[in-house]
Amino acid sequence: AGFYPYTPLHLRSLGLEHASAWMSLGQITEIIAMFALGGLLVRWRLKWIFAAGLTLGVVRFALSALDTRAGLITGILLHGASFTLVLITAQIYVDQRVDPAWRGRAQALLSLVNGGFGNMLGYLGTGGWFALCTASGTTRWPAFWGGLSAAMAAVLVFFLLSYRGRSTGLSPAPAPPAS
């Protein structure tokens, strides 16, 4: 949740105006990642696609922590791919792994967690972290983004150690009902 509210502030602090235009660069890589996702799904397990998205997120925040224009813009470019590989893969996971009778509820819960409670807690947490990294109107961007990168790295390690899934990416299409 730290990307959307604080990247524009960091862009301005680096002398880059028109934050919306710079932020839209992430949409380009998001679209590319969506096209690539189909190929990844037949070659990689969902675990590794999700882990790749989390890894891109760690790198995105680490690059932003460099406090340079190039680092921040590269981080923005990585955001689109990270977003797709994490959030879209999570939706695919629910679609593939949850019993059809429960799938609608599971997708609704995923939306509530991602767009509701998760977003709210993320914004509150990053807001508190931002306040801790800001003194006298000056933000210590390396500390801010570095902290988010470390937190995301911890999530990545937890995910890699705890996730147990199937040995294949997508499950085969269900057989048509017998007539």
Named regions from a protein language model:
Residues A1-S24:
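Helix-loop boundary and gating motifs at the non-cytosolic
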Residues E17, V98-V113:
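Loop-to-transmembrane helix entry/capping segments in MFS-fold secondary transporters
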Residues L85-D99:
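Intracellular juxtamembrane helix-capping segments at the cytosolic ends
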Residues F144-S179:
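Multi-pass alpha-helical transporter architecture, strongest
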Residues I32-L46, F130-A131:
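Helix-to-loop junctions at the C-terminal end of transmembrane segments
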